[in-house]
């Protein structure tokens, strides 16, 4: 009898939510992939593609990393077992990574922000970044660079 093939849960990561605002408001210094400790209704809500990372941030307390202000709406088919949409969620990282992040976030002006939320091999993951806040003139400078690049590309297209 032939063996059954193991069902593939998807080739690459299935992105649920991205925090575009973080890349605009912060200088991203380093990124880390962390697992999430979730309840059943949170996973079902994420599988439906519903989440918002806009106001999210991560904090280190007692050697554990916690994700705050990430909105995962209640599962529509859930009953009294539904979760609180903005509850703090524990992130799973290696001890060495937590120690390194703790040392770096103690420096002035550094924070941990979520960049994206996705499923990898059936497990919910969040990409967090060690970031430093941008000032208003930094944001304007980035916008000016982007506009100059667009103008250059337009000019090249017209020449062809």
Curated annotation (Swiss-Prot):
Recorded GO CC terms: cytosol
Main location per the UniProt record: cytoplasm
Superkingdom to which the source organism belongs: Bacteria
Database matches in Pfam families: SmpB
One GO term of the biological process aspect: trans-translation
Compartment(s) where it occurs, according to its Swiss-Prot or TrEMBL record: Cytoplasm
Region (Disordered): 1-23
InterPro entries: SmpB (IPR023620), SsrA-bd_prot (IPR000037), SsrA-bd_prot_CS (IPR020081)
Keywords assigned: Cytoplasm, RNA-binding
A GO molecular-function annotation: RNA binding
Summary of the function given for this chain in its UniProt record: Required for rescue of stalled ribosomes mediated by trans-translation. Binds to transfer-messenger RNA (tmRNA), required for stable association of tmRNA with ribosomes. tmRNA and SmpB together mimic tRNA shape, replacing the anticodon stem-loop with SmpB. tmRNA is encoded by the ssrA gene; the 2 termini fold to resemble tRNA(Ala) and it encodes a 'tag peptide', a short internal open reading frame. During trans-translation Ala-aminoacylated tmRNA acts like a tRNA, entering the A-site of stalled ribosomes, displacing the stalled mRNA.
NCBIfam families: PRK05422.1 (NF003843), smpB (TIGR00086)
UniProt record similarity statement: Belongs to the SmpB family.
Name listed for the protein in its UniProt record: SsrA-binding protein
Source organism of this protein record: Thermobifida fusca (strain YX)
Designated gene of the protein: smpB
């Amino acid at each position: 009898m032939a063996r059954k093939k193991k069902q593939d849960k998807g080739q690459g990561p299935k992105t649920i939510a991205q925090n575009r605002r973080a890349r605009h408001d912060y200088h991203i210094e380093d990124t880390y992939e962390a697992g999430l400790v979730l309840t059943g209704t949170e996973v079902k809500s994420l599988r439906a593609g519903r989440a918002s990372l806009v106001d999210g941030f991560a904090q280190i307390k007692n050697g554990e990393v916690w994700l705050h202000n990430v909105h995962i709406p209640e599962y529509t088919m859930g009953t009294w077992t539904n979760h609180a949409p903005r509850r703090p969620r524990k992130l799973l990282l290696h001890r060495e990574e937590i120690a390194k992040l703790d040392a770096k976030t103690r420096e002035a002006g550094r924070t941990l922000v979520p960049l994206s939320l996705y499923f990898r091999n059936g497990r919910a993951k969040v990409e967090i970044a060690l970031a430093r806040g941008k000032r208003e003139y930094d944001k304007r400078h980035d916008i000016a660079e982007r506009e100059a690049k667009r103008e250059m590309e337009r000019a090249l297209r017209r020449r062809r």
